[in-house]
Amino acid sequence: LSIRRQRQMCIRDRVGNPAFEVTKGSITFYGKNLLELSPEDRSHEGIFLSFQYPVEIPGVSMVNFMRAAVNEQRKYKGLPALTASEFLKLMREKRAVVELDNKLANRSVNEGFSGGEKKRNEIFQMAMLEPRLSILDETDSGLDIDALRIVAEGVNKLKTPDTSCIVITHYQRLLDYIKPDIVHVLYKGRIVKTAGPELALELEEKGYDWIKKELGE
């Protein structure tokens, strides 16, 4: 998606950032208006956002953080909380998806993690929460080729017929690993071009100026 400020507003509106006010319109997700829900309830409804620059949370262990998140989600859905043994079993299964080292899983959230480890940790969180819609904001930013491959493979393993993923990137290299079904180009706050995966290759080769010319700019 080729957009900067508007892109951030679009994403933050969906996850409920209080710094942004929606003055008109609605965001409907599975029949519910997200604008009427708190950020945590939007998450419980199945929306996940990965950050371009994941933050560190000193003093909060990954185990406690994820157990609280998973059980709050289950409570919202009317399901019983996972026992300690059930949760640890689930955590082991999901760690394997992104090859997350057990030592990292037992440390404070993102504290002292490398850039690649932070991104891998976010895909691990995505695996634990099993969202219906994941928004990955420049997940490839700052990753070396090995970390990029592992993160992309994790995303691919989590793909199901019942889930969707919006991948925001400025580079073709991520799409060498994650094959998109549809590519959208946003310009000045609106979608101006939609096509299949071949559009990403064309953008990599030509840039974006040809789209502006098509728009008469």
List the model feature ranges, each with a label:
Residues 1-7, 11:
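Single conserved hydrophobic/aromatic residue that forms the stacking wall/gate
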Residues 16, 26-42, 110:
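ABC ATPase NBD Q-loop/coupling interface
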Residues 45, 55-132:
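ABC-family P-loop ATPase nucleotide-binding domains
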Residues 135-139, 146:
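Walker B catalytic motif
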Residues 148-161:
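Helical segment within the ABC ATPase nucleotide-binding domain
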Residues 162-178:
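Conserved H-loop
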